[in-house]
């Protein structure tokens, strides 16, 4: 019986499709439950003011452009530092998908289920970083074996 090759990263196409859906979901949740106040955050306000954006859904292309730059820079660093020659960009994109999925799940739990264990999204940042690093290390180990 032939052993199938294990995929540890998403393809670029699927990663981008999922990221687009997650960004639109995040923006939609902000519009529905917070009336667009997410654009008033310290990070997004200067960007929104620069482009004159008042609706979070209209910020989607800017966020996706930012993700594109992060994916390219992260893939370049993975190739240079970690010596991952294949699937470096897919690794970064999959990490973004996992981290953003956890963030969106937290948003859904806060808005729909009144989840208050983590009262502020800033407290979630270290947790998301740990999740991203843990997946990155695991996937990198698997990719180097392949």
Identify the meaning behind each predicted range:
Residues 2-146:
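Hydrophobic alpha-helical segments at protein termini of multi-pass membrane proteins
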């Amino acid at each position: 019986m032939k052993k199938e090759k294990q995929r540890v990263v998403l393809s670029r196409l699927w990663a981008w499709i999922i990221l687009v859906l997650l960004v639109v979901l995040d923006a939609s949740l902000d519009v529905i439950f917070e009336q667009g106040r997410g654009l008033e955050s310290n990070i997004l306000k200067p960007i929104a003011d620069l482009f004159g954006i008042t609706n979070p859904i209209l910020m989607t292309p800017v966020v996706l452009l930012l993700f594109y730059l992060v994916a390219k820079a992260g893939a370049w660093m993975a190739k240079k530092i970690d010596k991952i020659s294949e699937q470096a960009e897919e690794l970064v994109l999959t990490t973004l998908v996992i981290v953003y999925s956890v963030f969106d799940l937290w948003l859904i739990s806060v808005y729909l289920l009144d989840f208050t264990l983590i009262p502020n999204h800033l407290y979630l940042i270290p947790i998301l970083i740990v999740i991203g690093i843990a997946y990155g290390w695991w996937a990198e180990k698997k990719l180097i074996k392949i």
